[in-house]
Each structure stands twice: as C-alpha cells, then as structure tokens.
Amino acid sequence: MKRGEIPKPGGGQRKLGIPTVLDRFLQQAVAQVLQKRLDPTFSEHSYGYRPHRSAHQAVAQAQQYVAQGLDWVVDLDIEKFFDRVNQDRLLGELAKRVADKRVLKLIRAFLKAGVLEDGLVSPTDEGTPQGGPLSPLLSNLYLDALDQELTKRGHRFVRYADDCNIYVQSPRAGERVMKGISAFIARHLKLRINAAKSAVARS
C-alpha cells in the first residue's frame, strides 16, 4: 500500500493506506462477500458504513432518545481508532464468523502488507488502514463487541463508525457510563478514549 494523507475536519492530517489496483479489486470482492454474511449480525444501533443505513437515520434515532427524556449524552471518541485496532483480536473475531481459511489468510495479508512511504516500506503490526474497501467492514466487526456490551447494559446509544453517543437522564449517570465504558474499551478492545474529544454534555 501507498501512504496518503487528507485534512481532518478538526485539524491535522488523516493517514490513508491506499492499496494497489489489484489489491483494491481483491479487497472489494472479499468485502462484497463478507458484507452479506456479517452485516445482518451487527447491531441495529450501528449506522456507519452499512447498506441502507445513514447518518440521517442516526440523527433521527438520537432525537427520539432525547424526546424520551434522555437529554444528556456521553460522547465517546476512540483515539486513533483505525491506526490502533488490535489485529490479532480482529482476526480472532473474524475467525469466529468465517470458516474459510483462505479468506482469513487473505485478510491477514492485507493487514500485514506494510505501507510504502518515501520509498521505504513500514510494517503494519496494528490498525486497519483507512482507504481500502475492507476497512469499513472490519471496523464495524471490531466494534460490534462494544455494541453488544452497551446493549447488554441496557444503554440507549447510536454508533457511527468510531464515534459513539450514549443517551442518559443525568450528568451523574453520564459520568458513571463514561467511566465504565472507557474501562471496557481499554480492557476488551485494547483501545483508549480520546479524553480531549469525549465528554458528557446536555443534548
């Protein structure tokens, strides 16, 4: 893959891993097959990178929660999510749902391919590079454990890619949820919450 960068809305640069033409073709083919198998298993509260789901639907669901009196929101932003996905955990989750070892081997090769930057190849031991057709699907697979945990705890939430909003009745409840879910993300997903971009606030 080649390294590319685009400006981030909040400032700075977002790094992309741009696959070769052949790799993009192969990733697209694998993504189409896996999407049909994996997407029906994902949470109804997940809206990003999914067929027949949109940001407009996510906003409508959030407005419904607020109308029900859940007018405090725990706004979670996962720090450098795409760069820090634990590949072993991701491949383990994939192996639970995909039996074809050839597909698993191919995806492992995509993840471990390395990135070409300034004529040098850097290894990719963590993360799922943004810019490839498979990354959106793999990101939803990785964060499905978060969706399931939030559902198990009875939370009302909306997740769009790596941004997750949880709706609660009070700031005290929000702080409690922030602490508990941050610990879950660190312990089970091997990721961290971006404290500067995460907050409990009135909707």
Annotate each PLM feature.
Residues 1-5, 9, 41-203:
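Conserved polymerase palm-domain catalytic core
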Residues 9-10, 22:
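A short catalytic or substrate-binding loop motif that flags glycine-/basic-rich loops and adjacent residues
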Residues 15-18:
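Conserved phosphate-binding loops in nucleotide/dinucleotide-binding enzymes
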Residues 21-22, 26, 31, 59, ...:
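Duplex nucleic acid-engaging cores and interfaces of nucleic-acid transaction enzymes
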Residues 27-45:
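Electropositive, glycine- and tryptophan-enriched low-complexity nucleic-acid-binding patches
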